[in-house]
A protein has these predicted regions:
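N-terminal pre-Walker A segment at the start of P-loop NTPase domains
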Residues: 1-5
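Phosphate-binding P-loop
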Residues: 6-13
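Hydrophobic anchor at the beta1->P-loop junction of P-loop NTPases
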Residues: 16-18
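The conserved Walker
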Residues: 22
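Conserved lysine of the Walker
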Residues: 26
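Conserved nucleotide-sensing/catalytic segment adjacent to the nucleotide-binding pocket
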Residues: 47, 53-96
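Short phosphate-coordinating micro-motif centered on Lys-Gly-acidic
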Residues: 82-148
Length: 148
């Protein structure tokens, strides 16, 4: 449900970063967003390929990236992730280079497992959103919608 609500906020030229511990649900949330923005049924984790692309319309794409194994920003530039951003939505896990990403005005999504969770069947997550002024209205609307 959260992925559906998030997907409705995103448009071309958006960079969304996902941060949190291993196994917290970053890839799961990204897959949910991609499933809701495309007709793709099988979304593959970019853990080993670093980037997976999914078509939207015409020459527009969603880029799902995992920077866990990236060592420096030069490697990011070699891949071309930020080239022609106006034709992309970028979902980026493990944003190690936040200081380099400022010019792209990312929406930062941090996911944590809630402590003292009483549910034995599933773990609850805490999602925190932050970003530049570009995201202020969308974050406010999303907070109200999700009651974050």
């Amino acid at each position: 449900e959260t992925g559906i609500k998030l997907a409705n906020l995103f448009s071309l030229n958006d960079l969304i970063t996902f941060d949190g511990d291993l196994g917290v649900g970053k890839t799961f949330l990204c897959k949910s967003i991609i499933n809701n923005l495309t007709t793709i049924n099988e979304v593959v984790s970019p853990t080993f390929n670093i980037v997976q692309t999914y078509p939207l319309q015409k020459d527009e794409e969603i880029w799902h990236c995992d920077f866990y194994r990236i060592n420096n920003f030069e490697e990011v530039e070699e891949i071309g992730v930020f080239e022609d951003l106006k034709k992309k939505i970028i979902l980026l896990e493990w944003p190690k280079f936040n200081f380099e990403l400022g010019e792209y005005h990312p929406l930062n999504i941090n996911i944590e497992i809630k402590k003292n969770n009483r549910s034995s069947l599933s773990e609850l997550r805490k999602i925190s959103l932050s970003g530049s002024k570009k995201w202020d209205n969308k974050i406010k609307n999303l907070h109200n919608f999700l009651a974050l």
